[in-house]
Amino acid sequence: EALISNEKDNYLPKFSPDGSQIAPVEDRRTIKVRNIDSGDEVVLLDETQLFHMRDGDKYFSWSPDSKWLLVEFDQLLNNADVYLLDASAKQEPKALVNSGYYDRMPKWVQNGKQMIWMSNRNGLKSYATSGSTEYDVYSMFFTQEGWDEFNLSEEQYKLKKAIEEAQSEQETDEESSVEKEAKKILEKRNSKANNVVKGAAQVIQQRKDKEVEELQFDWDNLEDRVAK
């Protein structure tokens, strides 16, 4: 069964991580998002915002929570920017990187808490319309917490991890106490009831394992939280 069937040329489709949406490039100059179950579509970028030069010249990637897309946005021939698109199209596209140089191929890392991309802003380059150029890899931190952790010294980072491990062990001990009490209660019930409870617990745990944390963005001073 065709997921998209119309008179348009639809290519470079990318599924959202949760499998509920698909984002194709329509007629090479429009990026859409389509809900697979309902068939509803929204336009993220249209033909007035994109141009086409060759096959495969559109680059975008889904966020882990399936709510955002990073896109290489090149309206002009002499530079490319990185934009953040709301997959529901309720928010306007937001420029994350707008250096005036070529900023390309943005990718989500650290479960969506950061992105990395390539830029020739500080590399060797030809200022003619053609010629070779040198790219470096940069990273942007979407939260202040992530940026602060990145800038910790080695000793500070070790201390932070030690505190987190201690807190985790304490939580585990507390959970173990609860589990022991629960087991005592279950032992008083028949094996059939035990199996039902265990089965339900497994289903709940499986659902929790599949849950993806919704991404957070600290917009203030975002452009300053960049490392090469």
Located regions from the model:
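A structural signal for short secondary-structure junctions
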Residues: L76-L77, K107-Q110, S132, D220-E223
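A flexible loop/linker signature enriched in serine peptidases of the S9 family
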Residues: E1-Y11, S20-S38, D46-D55, K67-Y83, ...
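Ligand-binding grooves and catalytic loops that recognize ribose/phosphate and carbohydrate rings
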Residues: K58
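A structural motif specific to WD40 beta-propellers
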Residues: V42, P93-K94
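A short helix->beta-strand "capping" segment at the edge of beta-propeller domains
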Residues: A2, Q216-A227
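Residue-level detector of Asp-centered blade-edge/turn motifs that repeat once per structural unit
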Residues: P17-D18, P64-D65, Q110-N111
